């Protein structure tokens, strides 16, 4: 997916405020990647995608995790604020067919 396609997908899932936050993260990730010699486009993509599931209801996040075969640890199960990162990574793999593990891993963290 291109950055623009990812951006449109993210926009569908987030509030305007959180979408703006993701745009800012993408810009800062690209700046840091440029400075430290990392892949600028991958950093930008990971930045825009990092919170794609943040505004998704917890029940739907949990369904995405279960449907993806992800088993949460006890600590993860008790802390719903952790779910969006793992659900986001699963969503990228499943719904968006993102296969770049560096991007998926960055979203999962």
Give the location of each predicted region:
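N-terminal glycine-rich anion-binding loops that anchor highly charged ligand groups
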Residues: 20-22
